[in-house]
């Protein structure tokens, strides 16, 4: 059984070592353990386009794997940024699907990181009217949404 209290304490220790004052809440998100950090320094923790947050999540998962036997992958969020971003990406995906179906033309989304592309692919996999494909190379990899033939 995963010790969420111990994991929370490890994250809090990391924040202290970073000189960040913050509170950590534990929950679930998309069937994963979810830690949301509330802090006045949220912009610093999120970074431009979520880059700092992705790095923070990576470091937290390394620390948990090192300190807690059989620690699962956990989601780390700051001020609900990821939840809001996921909802926004899902809306973009739905809008692109509607446009592809209505115009019968492919719709190319802006470049996204692999996590964001996965959200689009998973969301539109449920739509029987469209197909999706990733194209290009990082960091300019994008998704093309097409009406299903």
What is the predicted function of each stretch?
Residues 1-149:
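RNA-contacting regions in translation and RNA-metabolism proteins
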């Amino acid at each position: 059984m995963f010790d969420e209290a111990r994991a929370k304490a490890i994250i809090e220790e990391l924040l202290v070592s970073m000189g960040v004052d913050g509170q950590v809440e534990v929950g679930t998100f998309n069937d994963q353990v979810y830690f949301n950090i509330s802090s006045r320094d949220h912009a610093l923790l999120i970074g431009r386009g979520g880059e700092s947050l992705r790095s923070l999540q990576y470091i937290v998962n390394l620390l948990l794997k090192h300190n807690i036997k059989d620690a699962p992958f956990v989601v780390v969020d700051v001020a609900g940024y990821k939840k809001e971003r996921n909802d926004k990406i899902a809306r973009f995906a739905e809008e692109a699907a509607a446009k592809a179906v209505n115009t019968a033309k492919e719709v190319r989304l802006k470049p996204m990181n692999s996590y964001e592309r996965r959200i689009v692919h998973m969301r539109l996999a449920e739509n029987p009217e469209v197909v999706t494909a990733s194209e290009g190379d990082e960091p300019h990899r994008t998704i093309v949404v097409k009406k299903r033939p």
